[in-house]
Amino acid sequence: MATLRVDEIHKILRERIEQYNRKVGIENIGRVVQVGDGIARIIGLGEIMSGELVEFAEGTRGIALNLESKNVGIVLMGDGLMIQEGSFVKATGRIAQIPVSEAYLGRVVNALAKPIDGKGEIIASESRLIESPAPSIISRRSVYEPLQTGLIAIDSMIPIGRGQRELIIGDRQTGKTAVATDTILNQKGQGVICVYVAIGQRASSVAQVVTTFHEEGAMEYTIVVAEMADSPATLQYLAPYTGAALAEYFMYRERHTLIIYDDLSKQAQAYRQMSLLLRRPPGREAYPGDVFYLHSRLLERAAKLNSLLGEGSMTALPIVETQSGDVSAYIPTNVISITDGQIFLSADLFNAGIRPAINVGISVSRVGSAAQIKAMKQVAGKSKLELAQFAELQAFAQFASALDKTSQNQLARGRRLRELLKQSQANPLPVEEQIATIYTGTRGYLDSLEIEQVNKFLDELRKHLKDTKPQFQEIISSSKTFTEQAEILLKEAIQEQLERFSLQ
């Protein structure tokens, strides 16, 4: 039997003592006293911050929202079905953050930035707080670059600039998502990173949007953040902030970004659900008192940065759903007051076959012509006024028995102008073709055509102009001005097309 000598024992003991590393860890731990409906109440978490992440024994995470004298109200970032009364909860000491990187482009993720498209993990070396402060006044500059949507009605009369917040508002099934997705499709080749945030949508609707992006080649510059209708309210509430954090990552890297929130009504409803379950006092329409702050802190993150920060931008297009066209409800009025204008989609126009169903009369962009190229200003300057006068005259004509020749001509011109604003879905037009289209309508070249022929004529004109007068596109894209030479080329193309069209 082998025996250890005293000096060997001494040596082993010395080595063990030297290797001993005394770690004292202090953890903030509490116990669950109540759980259900996506809410947990915890006792014992004495030194916890508002918004701090907590971790339950079975792995579910949550966010501390209510800090009360006797307990802490936690909203769960999962179903929480395995959480038991009396189980331990650990405060992490961290605020919610997500990984960010270029690798997110082309992917579909959830509100925690975890991939849900089955294409494997996303490698990211950096992270950003989900809720970051908005850029300060000094960090910004005024909006001056156009963000082309590809929709004639918007780019000519309700222009959107890079760094602007423009609300898309309307009843359900009026084409709000179509306007937003067409805008994303039109950013192809423009160097704009797009983020589409789907909040509380049907999974089939989100799948349809993602399929459209794949088919049109838009997914390579787009990130989709999706929380479906069956997701916990906490994740539906977080999804827009996650999208904003991903867009900010690119904005601060001197890139231009576009973010769509589809839609903020669902986020407000999720927040209302959480607040009522946490027993916060309800206000108007049962929303909590800070529902304005919910949206203002999100939308203020959209900005055009100054030259010191690289002139990146984040353009936000929030969507809000109205009930029976009531824009005076709580959430619509809140978001209208936060944004730099609104695009109002009308159910009546949609049902009348005018699509996109944009009501140009009450839609407005508070940035205005600062976000238009000079050529568009020159050609489309008076078109909004002409359409407004047409709508007024049309209402009057319903009661008048006989109209004079001038009024009849004005009505005929107005009908053709309204016709040229029609566009099929997923068919955005480049700005040069939009200018040619508007010029043709406002200068009276469509007056001799039947209304049913207008769009066919314009489609053929745009093709003819592209094939026979490529210089027109070069002049507009290089000088951004509607020069005399461009006008001569366009007039020639219109006359040639009118002659060809009359022979058909």
From Swiss-Prot:
The EC number of this protein is 7.1.2.2
Family statement drawn from the similarity comment of this UniProt entry: Belongs to the ATPase alpha/beta chains family.
Q: Does the keyword Chloroplast apply?
A: yes
UniProt cross-references to InterPro entries, sorted A to Z: ATP_synth_asu-like_sf (IPR023366), ATP_synth_asu_C (IPR000793), ATP_synth_asu_C_sf (IPR038376), ATP_synth_F1_a_nt-bd_dom (IPR033732), ATP_synth_F1_asu (IPR005294), ATPase_a/bsu_AS (IPR020003), ATPase_F1/V1/A1_a/bsu_N (IPR004100), ATPase_F1/V1/A1_a/bsu_N_sf (IPR036121)
Outline the subunit composition.
F-type ATPases have 2 components, CF(1) - the catalytic core - and CF(0) - the membrane proton channel. CF(1) has five subunits: alpha(3), beta(3), gamma(1), delta(1), epsilon(1). CF(0) has four main subunits: a, b, b' and c.
Q: Where in the cell is it found?
A: Plastid, Chloroplast thylakoid membrane
Report residues binding ATP: 170-177
Fetch the NCBIfam families from UniProt: atpA, PRK13343.1
Q: Which UniProt keywords apply?
A: ATP synthesis, ATP-binding, CF(1), Chloroplast, Hydrogen ion transport, Ion transport, Membrane, Nucleotide-binding, Plastid, Thylakoid, Translocase, Transport
State the HAMAP family in the record.
ATP_synth_alpha_bact
Return the broad EC class: translocase
Say what the protein does.
Produces ATP from ADP in the presence of a proton gradient across the membrane. The alpha chain is a regulatory subunit.
How is this protein positioned relative to the membrane?
A: Peripheral membrane protein
Extract one GO cellular component term from the record. chloroplast thylakoid membrane
SUPFAM superfamilies assigned to the protein according to its UniProt record, in alphabetical order: C-terminal domain of alpha and beta subunits of F1 ATP synthase, N-terminal domain of alpha and beta subunits of F1 ATP synthase, P-loop containing nucleoside triphosphate hydrolases
Task: Kindly list the organism's lineage.
Answer: Eukaryota, Viridiplantae, Streptophyta, Embryophyta, Tracheophyta
List GO BP terms, alphabetically.
proton motive force-driven ATP synthesis
- Protein's name according to its UniProt entry: ATP synthase subunit alpha, chloroplastic
Q: Which GO terms describe its molecular function?
A: ADP binding; ATP binding; proton-transporting ATP synthase activity, rotational mechanism
Record-linked Gene3D superfamilies? 2.40.30.20, ATP synthase alpha/beta chain, C-terminal domain (1.20.150.20), P-loop containing nucleotide triphosphate hydrolases (3.40.50.300)
